[in-house]
């Protein structure tokens, strides 16, 4: 990026946790990044770093029964703000990007059935909003050309994913 000068990074984060009721918890967090670098073309925000991030989580656990059996529910929301993209102005028009990416949101969830201290079954999903970055590879139609670039990934490239599993605890 032709660094010619100084760079700096400032960040601010605030987090709040709140127990709404027995077993019902929330967590919220906000993070702000201000990362800039002096380039030969002037001071610019660091590419592919969102200035704003927001996180929210809601979880609920039922009361434990015999053998510690219970249900657990967890939902997480993430907001990722716009990010400055590397300068592609000198590329041919079909390989030029906007100056900034779009902001986006992600939603994840997991549900767990606890049968005992030693055995659990869970099911969940990630990226339930199915957010995907369009064209994560620049000039993918010309992989041996000068404009081919796989480094400009600022958002998920896979859609929603589901999973399930078992947990066994061995004493």
Enumerate the language-model features and the residues they cover.
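Flexible, surface-exposed loop regions and adjacent strand-edge segments
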Residues: 33-34, 42-50, 89-96, 134-147
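Transmembrane beta-barrel architecture of outer membranes
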Residues: 51-55, 106, 161
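Flexible, active-site-adjacent loop/turn segments at secondary-structure boundaries
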Residues: 1, 46, 102, 126-127
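Surface-exposed coil/turn segments at beta-strand junctions on protein surfaces, enriched
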Residues: 19-21, 49, 102, 114, ...
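C-terminal beta-signal and adjacent terminal beta-strands/loops
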Residues: 26, 81-88, 112-171
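Aromatic-acidic/polar surface patches that form glycan- and anion
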Residues: 5-6, 47, 100-101, 155-156
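Outer-membrane beta-barrel transmembrane domain signature
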Residues: 80, 88-90, 96-108, 114
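Gram-negative outer-membrane beta-barrel transporters
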Residues: 2-85
